[in-house]
């Protein structure tokens, strides 16, 4: 099974991806996480350091694939999750899609691409050009990380459009949305009402999720010394269980940008009255 995780830049995709990878490993699966971001920090919370990228390794070998060994590019992370960082082209030059393609090509050359139960692509930001939409070419499911905000859901809608486009050529489904560190979900609910898709999980506003990124540890590793965090791990285990059940998923219909802008902005400008306030108002009118 191959997963591609997308979402607005800074929304917490890498933190979410790392914890999902560990959750899948806890369920007995052999997992490979591939970071698809020139910053090459996707697997930081799994390994505790910035591992060398595949592109850097290939350059050091003059692109002689036969001189590259699995241990040159695959690093063992927390919980037994294997980690790879694709890296990226020089800033302002090249194409990220080419880098992803070279990464998959090398892993296949090493007979590593088909050795895993789950491969998770953690893809940078909300860039959905042909290049950074490339992981969708290999994925069975796409997961979109969002919050309860306008910008994140606007980005989610554009990513959903990419899933719809890629689903024309191979079996690809949107597994659903993951709400990350959000105190409310009313805007998320408004969006999925307009654009039907599953919501896999809503993680509340938990400061330890942000802290885990700074510490370079997953929530599972932090919970080893602080059992009070086990309840946070349960959110990720729930996501893993849903994925392993191979959900039907959806080919999202999406919404035109202008329609979505009107829908979400109207939610902000004309919020629904508080339920308690509405009941009080009705009593006053009796």
From Swiss-Prot:
One of its GO terms (molecular function) is ATP binding. Mg(2+) binds at residue 14. ATP binds at residues 10-15, 39, 180-181. It is an enzyme of class 1 (oxidoreductase). Keywords: 4Fe-4S, ATP-binding, Chlorophyll biosynthesis, Iron, Iron-sulfur, Magnesium, Metal-binding, Nucleotide-binding, Oxidoreductase, Photosynthesis. Its cofactor is [4Fe-4S] cluster. InterPro entries: NifH/chlL_CS, NifH/frxC, P-loop_NTPase, Protochlorophyllide_ATP-bd. Its EC number is 1.3.7.7. Gene3D superfamilies: P-loop containing nucleotide triphosphate hydrolases. The keyword rRNA processing does not apply. The keyword Nucleus does not apply. Binds 1 [4Fe-4S] cluster per dimer. It catalyses: chlorophyllide a + oxidized 2[4Fe-4S]-[ferredoxin] + 2 ADP + 2 phosphate = protochlorophyllide a + reduced 2[4Fe-4S]-[ferredoxin] + 2 ATP + 2 H2O. It comes from the Bacteria. GO terms for biological process: light-independent chlorophyll biosynthetic process; photosynthesis, dark reaction. Pathway: Porphyrin-containing compound metabolism; chlorophyll biosynthesis (light-independent). [4Fe-4S] cluster binds at residues 95, 129. Pfam families: Fer4_NifH. Homodimer. Protochlorophyllide reductase is composed of three subunits; ChlL, ChlN and ChlB. Component of the dark-operative protochlorophyllide reductase (DPOR) that uses Mg-ATP and reduced ferredoxin to reduce ring D of protochlorophyllide (Pchlide) to form chlorophyllide a (Chlide). This reaction is light-independent. The L component serves as a unique electron donor to the NB-component of the complex, and binds Mg-ATP. Belongs to the NifH/BchL/ChlL family. This is Light-independent protochlorophyllide reductase iron-sulfur ATP-binding protein.
